[in-house]
């Protein structure tokens, strides 16, 4: 399935039905009064979070969503049928913003959460409303009102508690694959991961925690370089980051600094998010050299650094213990 995490749509509420001018025409009622009914209200357009959806792909080709119009009123003060509500399903974690102003209108996180994206117009009034002592046979009625019409920006931000970050080829996809049932594409070249991968890792209690493998960052990602803003947004909701550094890199300390700089440049509090610094691919470093690499990273970051091999399955239980401790589970 193609992963689409941004979409622009237009929503239009249904137009209200017109009221009508009508008069009672019944036997034995020679001077029947006004009986024009009101128009039905236009239908609303509603966005609803659905846990079965994982992408905004449905909005790639369909951009305009319009609810039904209300029907005109009828004689004998009959109100017209209101337009049906149009419900649009979106993935949980979808933010809804006004396209031109950028104002946040809603954040649909929990399944079933709803947001009215365009209200339908009110129905017009029939002439029965205009009966008065001065005017016993009013002809006046009003037309229905147009529904609202809004241009919207939808942005999907994945609902993962733990985000795995690092430069391309740091081993993020391998780690999420061995910790969970996720099966991301894995190969030995940069940018193998072009979409975020989600995996569920079981806690000691048996409950699941969602991990997200975020596509590799590069220098300038916060300004849009590489995969840039397209995927940095997906770690905004995480409670904890696992920052992987490739032990086989020519300069692990510089790799660390690049990612930290991008987190700082992007903002949204990411650089201050709780983070575990992890040296991966320990099998690529001589045992005698490993303490020096770890010390360099600890001095540069001011953090404790753990050491694993995702490919070999080394020290993964210790890593998970650190994760659960940070999450308080």
Swiss-Prot record:
Gene Ontology CC terms, in alphabetical order: cytoplasm
GO biological process: ribosome biogenesis
Positions bound to ATP: 166-173, 191-195, 213-216, 280-283, 309-311
Top-rank taxon: Bacteria
Recorded GO MF terms: ATP binding; GTP binding; GTPase activity; magnesium ion binding
Domain Obg: 1-159
OBG-type G domain ranges (all copies): 160-328
Signal sequence annotation: none
EC number: 3.6.5.-
SUPFAM superfamilies: Obg GTP-binding protein N-terminal domain (SSF82051), P-loop containing nucleoside triphosphate hydrolases (SSF52540)
Main enzyme class: hydrolase
UniProt keyword list: ATP-binding, Cytoplasm, GTP-binding, Hydrolase, Magnesium, Metal-binding, Nucleotide-binding
Compartments where found: Cytoplasm
Pfam families, sorted: GTP1_OBG, MMR_HSR1
Cofactor(s) named in the record: Mg(2+)
Annotated residues for binding of Mg(2+): 173, 193
UniProt cross-references to PANTHER family, sorted A to Z: DEVELOPMENTALLY REGULATED GTP-BINDING PROTEIN-RELATED, MITOCHONDRIAL RIBOSOME-ASSOCIATED GTPASE 2
Protein family per UniProt: Belongs to the TRAFAC class OBG-HflX-like GTPase superfamily. OBG GTPase family.
Subunit-structure text: Monomer.
Role of this protein: An essential GTPase which binds GTP, GDP and possibly (p)ppGpp with moderate affinity, with high nucleotide exchange rates and a fairly low GTP hydrolysis rate. Plays a role in control of the cell cycle, stress response, ribosome biogenesis and in those bacteria that undergo differentiation, in morphogenesis control.
Protein name: GTPase Obg
Organism: Synechococcus sp. (strain CC9902)
Gene that encodes it: obg
């Amino acid at each position: 399935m193609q992963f689409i995490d941004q979409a622009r749509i237009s929503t239009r509420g249904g137009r209200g039905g017109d009221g009508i001018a009508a008069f009672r025409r019944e036997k034995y009622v020679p001077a029947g009064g006004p009986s024009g009914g009101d128009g039905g209200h236009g239908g609303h357009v509603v966005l609803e979070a659905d846990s079965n959806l994982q992408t905004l792909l449905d909005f790639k080709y369909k951009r305009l969503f319009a609810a039904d119009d209300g029907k005109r009123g009828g004689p004998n003060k009959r109100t017209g049928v209101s337009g049906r509500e149009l419900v649009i399903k979106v993935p949980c974690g979808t933010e809804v913003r006004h396209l031109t102003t950028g104002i946040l209108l809603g954040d649909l996180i929990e399944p079933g959460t709803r947001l009215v994206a365009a209200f339908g117009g009110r129905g017009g009034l029939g002439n029965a409303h205009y009966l008065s002592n001065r005017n016993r046979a009013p002809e006046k009625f009003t037309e229905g009102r147009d529904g609202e019409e809004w241009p919207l920006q939808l942005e999907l931000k994945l609902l993962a508690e733990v985000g795995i970050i690092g430069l391309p080829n740091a081993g993020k996809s391998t780690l999420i694959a061995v910790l969970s049932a996720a099966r991301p594409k894995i190969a030995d070249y940069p940018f193998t991961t072009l979409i975020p991968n989600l995996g569920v890792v079981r806690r000691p209690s048996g409950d699941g925690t969602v991990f997200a493998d975020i596509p590799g960052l590069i220098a300038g990602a916060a300004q849009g370089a590489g995969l840039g803003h397209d995927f940095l947004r997906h770690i905004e909701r995480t409670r904890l980051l696992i920052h992987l550094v490739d032990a086989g890199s020519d300069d692990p300390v510089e790799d660390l600094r690049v990612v930290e700089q991008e987190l700082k440049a992007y903002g949204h509090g990411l650089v201050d998010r709780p983070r575990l610094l992890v040296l991966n691919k320990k099998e690529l470093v001589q045992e005698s050299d490993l303490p020096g690499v770890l010390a360099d990273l600890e001095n540069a970051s001011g953090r404790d650094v753990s050491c694993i091999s995702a490919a070999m399955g080394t020290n993964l239980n210790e890593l998970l213990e650190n994760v659960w401790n940070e999450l308080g589970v």
